[in-house]
């Protein structure tokens, strides 16, 4: 949320920016993104929360319900709402900061209930009812979805790095257990099958980390190069793919790490069962797998991201080193398959493209 205000705010919300970026715990406020409504999760344009203007410029009263709000007790959440006479769909949504307190008094936010979730228990998630809550317009009216998309890029990137974190911890737990658990007179890490599995988990972890940080590199480069640059198009393509792939890998890795620990890994109180539960949400929030796939299609179609991707991959494959020669050959074969798939998508109708996304 602080990143968003730094980019789009005109200075009128400096108070909240300072609170969100404070180093002193007593002054710190946490941010959140209240986006999902009961009738519109991924279909953001169906949101029904309304924002009525007040006599004060840039100040609105928000009325509506938000259905799945993570970090529900945030001090300065961002909320999407529709002003009177704004168009339907995402084009009519504006972005507001809705603090939990206004002039020292509680804002008109009603926390209906907390969700009883499978995992991420340490992050309170619940339903919020806005009953004429005071909200401050962020940026320009009816540009809220664009601003929120900017925030989603960042959130998807942190989702990818969070997935890498879960994979790393799960791998560590599996390695430690395998190094200490004895069976049939030796530690189980000495058995060929376990050696193979631990190596494969390690490769997956390192690949996921490399991919996530490569996407992060282009996210940072885009800040310097602007939205018309190759870095921007690569960022828009790599971030959803990194989110999609690392989330799935975290679920698989945490599941197998639990298996390595045997029955103990399945018992509450052991780290692996919590990692497994927490990993389940990674493919869901900030865009499900299908939503991300459709986003990639849009980026390829509307922003020609493949024009930046193809030379980027060719440069990566242009290496001369004996240790990566065979790997580069394997990747080059998959790269050719990717190019063929892109050509097919470009020549088929929209329904075919979505089905095979």
Regions found by a protein language model. Name each.
Residues 1-5:
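Low-complexity, highly charged intrinsically disordered N-terminal segments
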Residues 39-42, 68-70, 87, 117-124:
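Short Gly/Pro-enriched turn/cap motifs at secondary-structure boundaries
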Residues 138-151, 176-192, 215-234, 259-278, ...:
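Conserved catalytic-core motifs characterized by acidic clusters
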Residues 156-224, 306-314, 319-357:
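Extended amphipathic alpha-helical segments enriched in small hydrophobics
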Residues 233-314:
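Alpha-helix capping/hinge segments and adjacent helical runs
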Residues 101-108, 112, 117, 124-155, ...:
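A glycine-rich, basic-preceded beta-loop-alpha segment at the flavin cofactor/substrate interface
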Residues 59-108:
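A short core secondary-structure module
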Residues 8-49, 53-58, 213-232, 239, ...:
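Internal maturation/activation junctions in enzymes
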């Amino acid at each position: 949320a602080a990143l968003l205000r730094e980019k789009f705010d005109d200075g009128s919300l400096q108070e909240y920016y300072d609170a969100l970026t404070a180093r002193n715990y007593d002054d710190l406020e946490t941010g959140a993104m209240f986006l999902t409504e009961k009738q519109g999760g991924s279909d953001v344009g169906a949101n029904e929360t309304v924002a009525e203007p007040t006599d004060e410029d840039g100040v609105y009263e928000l009325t509506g319900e938000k259905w799945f709000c993570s970090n529900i007790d945030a001090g300065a959440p961002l909320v999407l709402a529709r002003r009177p006479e704004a168009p339907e769909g995402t084009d009519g949504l504006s972005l507001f900061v809705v603090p939990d307190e206004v002039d020292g008094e509680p804002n008109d936010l009603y926390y209906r209930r907390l969700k009883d979730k499978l995992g991420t228990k340490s992050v309170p998630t619940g339903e919020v009812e806005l009953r004429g809550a005071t909200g401050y317009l962020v940026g320009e009216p009816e540009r809220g979805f664009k601003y929120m998309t900017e925030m989603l890029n960042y959130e998807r990137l942190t989702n990818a790095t969070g997935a890498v974190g879960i994979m790393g911890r799960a791998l560590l737990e599996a390695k430690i257990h395998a190094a200490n658990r004895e069976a049939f007179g030796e530690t189980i890490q000495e058995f060929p099958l376990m050696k193979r599995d631990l190596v494969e988990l390690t490769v997956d972890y390192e690949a996921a980390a490399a991919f996530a940080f490569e996407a992060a590199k282009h996210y940072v480069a885009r800040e310097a190069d602007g939205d018309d640059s190759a870095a921007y198009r690569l960022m828009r393509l790599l971030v959803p793919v990194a989110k999609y792939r690392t989330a799935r890998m975290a679920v698989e890795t945490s599941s197998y790490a639990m298996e390595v620990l045997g029955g103990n890994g399945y018992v509450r109180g052991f780290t692996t069962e919590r990692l497994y539960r927490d990993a389940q949400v990674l493919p869901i929030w900030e865009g499900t797998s299908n939503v991300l796939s459709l986003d990639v299609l849009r980026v390829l179609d509307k922003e020609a991201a493949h024009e930046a991707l193809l030379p980027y991959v060719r440069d990566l494959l242009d290496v001369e080193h004996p240790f990566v020669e065979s790997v580069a050959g394997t990747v080059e074969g998959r790269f050719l398959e990717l190019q063929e798939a892109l050509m097919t998508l470009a020549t088929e109708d929209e329904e075919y493209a979505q089905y095979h996304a």
